[in-house]
Amino acid sequence: MFSWALVFLIFALVAGVLGFTGLAGTASSIAWILFVVGLIVSLIFLVAGRRPTV
């Protein structure tokens, strides 16, 4: 998930440098959403992995 966020971030930076501002804005929004989703999923797995032993 984080690798896709990084890909879209790099894509947004390149598009912004080349002047495609609408495309850069869309790609940066996608990168931000993927980063947040990846962070939430990571936290869920971190909490779910700490089950007490019986």
From Swiss-Prot:
The chain crosses the membrane at residues 4-24, 29-49. It holds the Pfam family DUF1328. InterPro entries: DUF1328. GO terms for cellular component: plasma membrane. The keyword Transferase does not apply. It is found in: Cell membrane. Keywords: Cell membrane, Membrane, Transmembrane, Transmembrane helix. It is a multi-pass membrane protein. Belongs to the UPF0391 family. This is UPF0391 membrane protein TERTU_3637.
